[in-house]
């Protein structure tokens, strides 16, 4: 039986999941329509991949969490936890990779530095994306091999319990090794986002001496971009904090509140960042306003028919 606090957090997680699927589904739909019109750009490809991977990631977070909370015995056979582990690696790594690619793309497109390496990368932005794809593939293959090793070791020990029956220190070391690829992309994304914020801030200071009208419009755009980046960094950090909380649940499996709180914290990022992207991207924002306008018109027609 769940406590009141646990029940409230479960409702929050469900709400986050619904918003996440709707927000990312909208992003994916808008860019898929552009793809059908042969208008899909590099940024559109990244946003589409990010949206699709996050939808699957949300389902994995919810499915895995609810099984652990309500039916932990389902994992006793070992097969389900194996499939979920594989799927988790694919969706989590893909989501982080696309988020990192988005950060790098904006960094190379918008930032302004005189550094030779930066200028070299900026002139070869179309080659950076395939390079990151190669890193993702290597990271996924390494993690797959490591997961297979862990699960095979458990089967050889005839450990039929879904919880990893090992010392706490050993478990955390295995999780750290398993997430090395993700940590690399996470660090890279944070570095590029911080550098872009610094570049925007410096450029904003340089614009202070320009004409007032131009200065105000550019300053507003820069402040908006910095707010989006700072929000992204905060949500990204919360996502990894949530994962750490969920990992720590394995050491105290009787504390369901810890797991539910971890799920709530983890799910903030995939849905929160999707709405930040919609509000920060002019094309997505205009499309969302058109959808809201259509919904408003439909509601008005329905009210007129009712009267």
UniProtKB/Swiss-Prot annotation:
Phylogenetic lineage: Eukaryota, Metazoa, Chordata, Craniata, Vertebrata
Membrane spanning residue stretches: 7-27, 43-63, 101-121, 127-147, 180-200, 228-248, 258-278
Cellular compartments per GO CC: plasma membrane
Remarks, miscellaneous: Most taste cells may be activated by a limited number of bitter compounds; individual taste cells can discriminate among bitter stimuli.
Keyword Chaperone: no
Database matches in Pfam families: TAS2R (PF05296)
Cytoplasmic domain ranges by topology: 28-42, 122-126, 201-227, 279-307
Keyword Cell division belongs to the record: no
Extracellular topology ranges: 1-6, 64-100, 148-179, 249-257
Entry's localization field: Membrane
InterPro entries for the chain: TAS2R
Glycosylation sites: 92, 158
Protein name: Taste receptor type 2 member 10
GO molecular-function terms, A-Z: bitter taste receptor activity; G protein-coupled receptor activity
Gene source species: Papio hamadryas
Record key words, sorted: G-protein coupled receptor, Glycoprotein, Membrane, Receptor, Sensory transduction, Taste, Transducer, Transmembrane, Transmembrane helix
Its biological purpose: Receptor that may play a role in the perception of bitterness and is gustducin-linked. May play a role in sensing the chemical composition of the gastrointestinal content. The activity of this receptor may stimulate alpha gustducin, mediate PLC-beta-2 activation and lead to the gating of TRPM5.
Membrane topology value: Multi-pass membrane protein
Family per record: Belongs to the G-protein coupled receptor T2R family.
